[in-house]
Amino acid sequence: MFEIKLNDRITEFLRKFKNSAKSNEGIDEDIDLFLKRHAIPMQSLLFYVKEYRKDSDLQCSIKELLKPLEFEFKPKAVRGLHYSEDFKKKLEFLKYQEQELEYQSMVKRSKSVFSLQEDDELTPSQINKQIKEQVTTVFNVLVSVISVVVAIWYWTGSSTNFPVHVRLLLCLFFGILVLVADVVVYNSYLKKLEEAKVKEKTKVEKKKVLSKITL
């Protein structure tokens, strides 16, 4: 935003305006502020000119007052510039207090997750189930790798004229590729499963009694 910079004519007009019969305490304070800042908003200047044209002693036009015309750009307001020292100290205290609460909340969440992981004790049936799942996974991975290796070996032998060492390298490459892909997918599955278990255990069950029936 910008304001009109006071020139000699505007300054003289404001002083006459202040000493006129139309002035009051509030207007005097505003004019003193404008004179001190050496600038005035355009809206205020138009208001003064409109009001005081009714007085024959203060005949003037806005065109005459704005010669020469210069603008005064208002400085950008800085947050907290006019805060008192006590208020600034209170804000700093509230800021540190909020940071402390966030830190304590984060520590509590971390402790709850670690306690859940440490307190997990597997039963024999759960151990057997995990062993079966791991054996099944290893078997499925081996089947996938062997199937791909056999398919590559058969394709390079029947459809192409690759030498034996090239066929072996292709089989080895695709076998390792399938093995790595299966391991990555399985690890991702285990990670998501563990996250789901932790999230489920950290949930707080809320019960609400809707009504009570007495027989």
Curated annotation (Swiss-Prot):
Present with 2030 molecules/cell in log phase SD medium. The chain crosses the membrane at residues 135-155, 168-186. It is found in: Endoplasmic reticulum membrane. One of its GO terms (cellular component) is endoplasmic reticulum membrane. Keywords: Endoplasmic reticulum, Membrane, Transmembrane, Transmembrane helix. InterPro entries: ATPase_Vma12 (IPR021013). It comes from Saccharomyces cerevisiae (strain ATCC 204508 / S288c) (Baker's yeast). It is a multi-pass membrane protein. This is Vacuolar ATPase assembly integral membrane protein VPH2. Required for vacuolar ATPase assembly.
